[in-house]
Amino acid sequence: MENIKVAKVGNVKFVNKGNELNGTLHLTAYHSIFSISENGKEIWTAYSMINNVKLCSNEKSFCIRIQCRDFMFFCWRFQSTEDAMDVYDTLQELMSINSINMLYAFYYMPSGDEEKLPSSWKSFLLENEYRRMGVGDSTQADGAGGNWRITKINENYSECHSYPQALAVPASISDSVIYYGCKYRSKNRFPTLTYLHKNSFSITRASQPLVGIRQNRSAQDEKLVEAIFATSIIPGKENLIVDARPSTNAMANIAVGAGSENMDHYRFAKKIYLGIDNIHVMRDSLNKIVNALKNTDISAAPPLIELLNRSSWLKHLANILQGAVLIVKTVHFRHAHVLVHCSDGWDRTSQLCALPQLCLDPYYRTIEGFFALVEKDWLSFGHRFAERCCHLPGKRIFTIDSSYSEEPPQSSPSSTLQYTFSTVRSALSGFSIDHSEKMMSPVFHQFLDCVWQIMDQFPNCFEFNERFLRRLLYHLYSCQYGSFLYNSERERAQASVSTHTRCIWDYFLSRKDEFKNPNYVPYDDVIMPDPSSLRWWSASFAQPDENMNIPSPSESPSL
């Protein structure tokens, strides 16, 4: 704090949705605190939640506009340009963190019930989750669980840095086959079990094969996939390899030494491309939502619907859910196995593995089960949270605009065009692009939105409520807990995260009653969402439902 210019500024106006509050602004090491003069209440903002800071000035106004990752957009208005500049410079100083171990999680000290609660870090063990599914259990009715085993080939993360140490593979496959076969998959992410359904058919996951222009093949990889599909067999049933990408993208990867399976060598299955776009398209989609909402600090007007629709956000969710439904049908109704991959197997693959399990297994629709699902398919299997969430944005989120106008654009074709060009020019987009941000993408955000869509269609089938999902989305970015820091289980272990930080599940377990669905009725059967009936999860964008879900006499404008 010794290098900051100011820690407290009086006579500041806090503006949100056009409403003004008078008060005093305090800047601490990890939060801004706005103390309201009228009632003494405080508005806290974690610096990790801030995604854009814009210093704006003209002859009449000096303000800082803030965009937060939870879509809380607000403005501080100051009495003088000196106050505005001092706060702007101080925020830059406080937020210019260049190491993950300097984030709030490493300094956060819980209080109350959370402090008394035993740490949740060791409450989830992947081996226990495999055993819950029946892996290694030959006493099941059909004995199929005994066709799987837990291997320690990745102990100390020796073969695949982004996989967990414990993995489930067919019992008929030796570690030697896996050792040689894993080199045929991108980042050594070889096919391995993520879910064994009660009918003994499986969902496995991997990364793309390294086919390349020479059409390389691997006898070990082919043997492993064949063994996976042979763990439970019903004659005449066709197993499925799901490539989440558009086929053109998969083919383009051949030029860089990767690609997709040559099905001449995997004759025991068929392959389907889902056409789900990559992280860059998804980032652009969220950018467009930010653009539609970005004036909600100075204006109470609803967002520009045409810009919301232009984002294609709900179309992307529909594509993901269509893939999830296909996997559910294949495993549960068609009694066949599914192998899922995209490029590296940690983005679209995680979505397409976790969402079907939510539909197939009622355990994952409980609070405890959802913890296990996130731990397994997102944290253990190496979703790159640090990259995708850009937890260390640095000074690139700070911009200055000396041509600031407090009049938001009107919703007309000409003003919309002007608005779009203005957005690009001013870099007010929620995710402006530089080198560090090319890997940023709302993949886990999309997953939570898809979960909400399923909850919206099956409101009584989930033990947790909508607020649970919103708080999980908030803490994805808050950096208050260590769970979502770093890019893999291995990196978190190397940083001793479980020793130096609190687990995200501590937050929810210490407040469990707040997140329970009062209408929950346990339902043991499979649920099947309708991907064509999606709505905007308006609360996640800090909007009332009527601002985003506008009825249409014909078809939904959202799709």
From Swiss-Prot:
Biological process annotations from GO = intracellular signal transduction; phosphatidylinositol dephosphorylation
Query: Which molecular function terms from Gene Ontology are attached?
Result: phosphatidylinositol-3-phosphate phosphatase activity
A matching Pfam family: PH-GRAM_MTMR6-like
Q: Which organism is it from?
A: Schizosaccharomyces pombe (strain 972 / ATCC 24843) (Fission yeast)
Q: Which reaction does it catalyse?
A: a 1,2-diacyl-sn-glycero-3-phospho-(1D-myo-inositol-3-phosphate) + H2O = a 1,2-diacyl-sn-glycero-3-phospho-(1D-myo-inositol) + phosphate
Query: Is Nucleotide-binding one of the keywords UniProt gives this record?
Result: no
The record's listing under InterPro entries reads: Myotubularin, Myotubularin-like_Pase_dom, PH-like_dom_sf, Prot-tyrosine_phosphatase-like, Tyr_Pase_AS, Tyr_Pase_cat
Keywords of the record: Cytoplasm, Hydrolase
In short, the EC number is 3.1.3.64
Sorted alphabetically, which CDD domains does this protein's record hold? PTP-MTM-like_fungal (cd17666)
- The positions flagged as active site in the entry are C342
State where the protein is found: Cytoplasm
Q: Please list the residue ranges annotated as the Myotubularin phosphatase domain.
A: 120-541
Task: Answer yes or no on keyword Hydrolase.
Answer: yes
List, alphabetically, the SMART domains matched.
PTPc_motif
Function description: Lipid phosphatase which dephosphorylates phosphatidylinositol 3-monophosphate (PI3P). Involved in the control of PI3P-dependent signaling and in the maintenance of endosomal system integrity.
Give the top-level enzyme category.
Answer: hydrolase
Belongs to which family? Belongs to the protein-tyrosine phosphatase family. Non-receptor class myotubularin subfamily.
> Record's superkingdom?
Eukaryota
Q: What is this protein called?
A: Phosphoinositide 3-phosphatase
Task: Name the major location.
Answer: cytoplasm
GO cellular component term of the entry, any: cytosol
